[in-house]
């Protein structure tokens, strides 16, 4: 995240640590109102794309630019979630095998983001016809 999502990132990081998840923080490591999200999102997306068993959580003011940046990396499949039906979070994993979840910190509460993270991290990918579609994206 950049400065816009810094507080939410710290909250989610703490939430995941309590649940004993291994968390690698790609930044920002301190609040800097002049930082730029690509400096943090691109390295995070590269890490996720290089390890098929990893997942990433990114955020910014809207989450949109962050998802666009992440999706520039081959193998990264970032989706944006706002405070909407949780079924969207489930489907992003079940059908799209999303490996990066992006939040707009200006549009979601910390608690709702944590709820979405918990669901998203535990939702399996269905594979089958959905895998065939995703494979076409990476060719």
Give the residues covered by each predicted segment.
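C-terminal binding/interaction regions
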Residues: 1-7, 86-139
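A short beta-strand-loop structural module common to alpha/beta enzyme folds
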Residues: 22-34
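Short amphipathic alpha-helical segments
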Residues: 10-13, 68-72, 114
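Glycine-rich phosphate/diphosphate-binding loop of Rossmann-like nucleotide-binding domains
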Residues: 1-22
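Short, structured active-site "lid" loops
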Residues: 39-58
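Mid-chain, well-packed structural core segment of small domains
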Residues: 59-106
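Short, conserved beta-strand edge motifs with alternating hydrophobic and charged residues
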Residues: 24-27, 56-60
